[in-house]
Amino acid sequence: MITVSNVSLTFGGQKLFSGADLKFMPGNCYGVIGANGAGKSTFLRILSGELEPTTGTVTIPAGQRLSTLKQDQFKYDAYPVLDTVIMGNQRLYDIMKEKDELYAKPDFSDADGERAAELEGEFAEMDGWNAESDAATLLTGLGLPVEMHTMLMGDLKGGEKFKVLLAQALFGNPDILLLDEPTNNLDNRSVAWLEDFLMNFPGTLIVVSHDRWFLNNICTHIVDIDFNQVKLYVGNYDFWYESSKMMQSLMNDQKKRREDKIKELQAFIQRFSSNKSKAKQATSRRKLLDQLTIEQMPASSRRYPWVCFTPEREAGKDRKSVV
């Protein structure tokens, strides 16, 4: 679970969003959408604790493990692929390495034996014996062939590294999973496998993606970053699209009615303010006019493609005929 309270962010003098109050619950998948530059990836960095918000707080219950899709494809170049995936649960990986170092000591002492026993107990509780097979299953599902599982990360291509880092994020049943564009570099089969995995994920899942089909298949909620606000909608991408259009239409209608009312009052005041018999009514309407305000709607950060072809001349009315 993640609780976001009054979070705002100003970046480079520009306000990306403000007053965000959200609660992300286990068992739900939240798709984060918005225009390029709206702050989707930045919002994920705030949730993960990598970036401090300008105002507000992000709260995660103690003991919950958070996993993110790493973006640095060169960080693990010196490590084998399987080890890189297992690093998704850093505590488990540290236990495995410390065990190996202890058992490799030529002067293995009683103290070393006691420490090894402690590590073995924790290792078993974390299902460590299945770590390599679990990592291999993730890699295979994402389309990385078995022969690459023992290679060094530095020997892989960019798309192959991405699959390893995605497997790393998925590894070890985290309580909270944050994924930024997870379908990049995946073919259709791997995307289908990932959808199935995420639909069965029991924790709190938050995904940034431009793939509306992917979001439709996995999301229970949509988080829309637009108009310098972060709003939560129940439902998948299509439901958000219809709901947001309806909400925008209602806001436009409300603004139009208020504008029409102001024009009506202004016309009455202008017409009858000098008429003694209508003076009280004009004064009453002036007070009402002073109470009416038109809230300026912030501009949307979305830009939709638009193409217009202007003809050089008007089209003829008669079709060409041959006699």
Regions found by a protein language model. Name each.
Residues 1-255, 309-323:
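ABC ATP-binding cassette signature C-motif
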Residues 298-314:
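Short, flexible cytosolic linker that couples an ABC transmembrane/permease module to its adjacent nucleotide-binding
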Residues 243-268, 272-296:
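Intracellular alpha-helical coupling/juxtamembrane segments of multi-pass membrane proteins
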Residues 121, 270-272, 305-307:
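Short hinge/gating elements
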